[in-house]
Structures are given as C-alpha cells and as structure tokens.
Design a protein with these regions (language model features):
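Helix-loop junctions and terminal segments of transmembrane helices
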Residues: 65-80, 152, 273-315
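Interfacial segments at transmembrane-helix termini and the short loops linking adjacent helices
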Residues: 44, 112-133, 329-345
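Interfacial transmembrane-helix starts/ends
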Residues: 12, 50, 83-98, 232, ...
Length: 345
C-alpha cells in the first residue's frame, strides 16, 4: 500500500507540473491559433501550417513503427536483467526509426506526384510546399522517441515542457517576427515553421546524453532473444491502433483541403474546432506520461491490484477534469466566434 501511495503521489506530482506546462503551452497556442494566425495570415496560409502538421503526424506514426509502446512496456525487463551498458533497447528503437525515416526520404519523390494530384487544384499553396512534410516528420519522429526515453528515466516534466511549452513559444516568436516585418516572405516563414521541432529535439537529446542512462549497444542480448516475438506482436497491435487513432484525428482536415471548394481556407476554419477539442486531451497527455512507466513496471511485476487501482484512479480524475473543460468550451463558443470574425463563423 505504501508503495502504491508513493507511486500515485509521484504520478500526481508529475501530472500537476506537466499539466501546468501543457496548459501554459496551450494558452500560448490558443493565442497563436485563435488570434494571431487568423488576424495576420490569410486562411490559406493558416491552413497550410495545419495540414502540413497533420500529414507529418500520420507519417511520423508510420515511421515509429510501434516501437514507442514497446520501449515503455519492455524497458523494465531490460533494466531488471541487464546492466545499462548492455541494454540495446534504445539502440533498436532509434535504429528502426532511422531506417523508416530514410525509406520515407527516398520514397517521397514517388509519393509526392500522387499527393499533388489531390491538392493542386483546390490547395495550390500546399502543392508548392509539400516537401516541408519531410523535416516536420523527421523531427516529430526524433522527438517522440526521445520523449519516451525521457519518460522512462522520470523526466516527464522536462519532456512536456519542451514539446508543449517551448515549441509554442518559438512558434509565437516566429509569428511575431512576421507581424513586425522581420520576415516579409511567407516562404521563409513556412520554411522556419517546418524546422522548429528540431529545437526541442536537440535540447532533449543533450539532456539524455548528459544523464548517461542509455548507451549505444549493437550486440543482441538474451532479453531481446527471449522477448522479440512478444515485442513484435505487442508493437504491431499498438501500431495498427495508433495509426487508426491518428488518421481519425487528422483525415478530416486532409479531406477538406483536397476536396472542399475552399481548400486550405476551409481547413483553417475546421482547425479552430479541432483545436478546442484537443484542449480536453491535455490532462490525459500529462497523466499518461507520468503513469505509463509505473504501469509498465506493474505489468512486469504482475501486480494486478496496483494496475487496477492505477487505471481506476486515473480514469476518474480524467473524467472529472475533461467534463469541466467541455462545459467551459461550450459556454464560450459565442465568444470564440466574435473574436475570430465572420470568416470563421
């Protein structure tokens, strides 16, 4: 019981701090999405930032190939049976990510013409900048993998700070540079935007290297030999589930941009609604990052009672918080329409 209470206290503490950074980041993101982008960019220019990100999210999920949940679930086994100098799980994860990103890079010239046929007529600005999906995807893959290993060593607060808060601050600075005339060419703006995720990638990579918690190991261990089949099945199941989840969240924007008469302008309007929905997802994101290592350890120890308590307590907390956020959003819909203007009504 004492161990469980300590685990819940750790999860609660990390969730609170993570939620603070995530909500602060969302406040800045809301200022960017609900005010700055609609006011200082055309709907097509705003829509381009959203559609590039949505395409990159789908491709990055493909490139991670289900390795992230595998790393989280099976790292306790590697930690228990191997010293960190012989733990090759991080090497396996990053190597597979590198291979998938390399395949995407070399196959993109063959994929691009197919995509251009879909978007060129209704979203010509996307056709001119579709190649920027590559740096966005690669940086998202790198950040996702680094984030998982930051969670494993307990640096969930730092990972959430970099991904949710720091990134949006940098986006705000780039937008302000556009507003102040320091950037006067939209091509330069969108080029900068596509590379912004590399900033938290570099910072988080440096922190993990300084921690000396992981090493590059190219020798197959007995743990990998024992669990490789189970890891492949587990990763494959999660991969298919996550792909469907990401597509469900992003395909509507892509379809609107390719089929709607307004193209990216209509996609920008739809983005406002989807952004408000993601606000309700914040508590879940912060709690997952804090609870997942604890859940993985409980699975490894076969502590079903702890798993039962963790799932029930986190689910109850998330239900209460999300219900409150939904109520606030519904009550403020008229205010959102008033601020955004008639184009977004």
């Amino acid at each position: 019981v004492a161990v469980f209470l300590f685990s819940m206290a750790t999860i609660r503490k990390q969730s609170i701090y993570s939620s603070i950074y995530i909500y602060a980041g969302f406040a800045i993101g809301a200022f960017n999405v609900l005010f700055l982008f609609p006011k200082f960019f055309t709907p097509e220019e705003f829509g381009l930032t959203r559609i590039l990100m949505d395409i990159a999210l789908i491709l990055s999920m493909i490139c991670t190939a289900g390795t992230l949940p595998v790393a989280l679930k099976f790292f306790p086994f590697y930690k228990h049976y191997l010293p960190k100098e012989k733990n090759e799980l991080p090497t396996l994860v990053f190597t597979l990510g590198l291979i998938m990103c390399t395949l995407l890079y070399f196959s993109f010239p063959y994929i691009e013409p197919i995509a251009l046929k879909k978007f060129s007529s209704r979203s010509p600005i996307l056709a001119n900048h579709l190649r920027l999906v590559l740096p966005l995807t690669i940086s998202l893959v790198a950040l996702s993998m680094l984030e998982v290993f930051a969670w494993i060593i307990g640096k969930t607060i730092l990972a959430n700070f970099l991904k949710e808060f720091m990134f949006r601050i940098v986006v705000l600075l780039v937008i302000l540079a556009w507003v102040l005339g320091m950037i006067n060419d939209y091509t330069i703006f969108i080029e900068l935007y596509a590379y912004l995720y590399f900033i938290p990638v570099v910072v988080l990579a440096w922190v993990l290297m300084r921690s000396q918690s992981f090493h590059l190991v190219f020798k197959k261990s007995k743990v990998t030999h024992k669990f490789s089949g189970m890891m492949a099945r587990f990763g494959g199941a999660y991969f298919l589930g996550n792909i469907l989840n990401v597509i469900a969240k992003t395909n509507d924007t892509i379809i609107i941009a390719s089929q709607s008469a307004g193209g990216l302008a209509d996609a920008a309007i739809f983005t406002i609604a989807t952004y408000l929905i993601t606000v309700m997802d914040v508590p879940q994101r912060s709690m997952v990052s804090a609870a997942t290592p604890q859940i993985a350890q409980a699975w490894k120890d076969k502590d079903l009672a702890k798993l039962d308590r963790l799932y029930k307590k986190t689910a109850l907390n998330l239900l209460v918080i999300a219900s409150g956020i939904l109520g606030v959003v519904i009550l403020n819909i008229p205010a959102f329409v008033h601020v955004l203007g008639p184009n977004y009504e």
